[in-house]
A protein has these predicted regions:
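Bulky hydrophobic segments
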Residues: 1-136
Length: 136
């Protein structure tokens, strides 16, 4: 496959949804350190944002390595297979390798919801309102 023009194509990282996802993740990490356990939000909020935060970075890396032929939004198959692989590794392989890791099926639901948010955003919405502030 032919790599993108330049060593990194950062089109996916310029998308407002990626910035919002990173902000949700980071703000929650700081908030989580200051607050008591608040149930589902405390335990699964960051799992929800895992795919929207990580997949654009991974796909940009694939492009830089010449493993991805286009720089457009992630396809449904890319979202599904990366989410499935991540869920399998984090919830089934991780607990076998690390004593502190715990398999939690609610995490799988959070990964799936995050994948659905990604798919919905990149295939059914425009978010033009936010694109003005995040243009490069």
């Amino acid at each position: 496959m032919k790599p993108h023009s330049g060593p990194w194509n950062l089109k996916l990282l310029k998308d407002p949804f990626w910035g919002i996802s990173i902000a949700c993740y980071v703000i929650h990490r700081f908030w989580q350190a200051l607050s008591p356990d608040s149930g589902w939000m405390d335990r699964h909020w960051n799992d929800l944002w895992m795919l929207p935060c990580a997949l654009p970075l991974i796909l940009s890396l694939y492009g830089a390595l010449g493993l991805r032929a286009h720089a457009s939004q992630p396809t449904g198959a890319e979202i599904f297979w990366h989410g499935l692989l991540w869920g399998f590794m984090a919830e089934f392989i991780g607990p076998l390798l690390f004593d502190h890791a715990v398999s939690d099926l609610w995490d799988l639901l959070a990964y799936a919801l995050g994948g659905f948010l990604m798919f919905f955003r990149w295939h059914f919405t425009e978010l033009r309102f936010f694109s003005i502030a995040l243009r490069f």
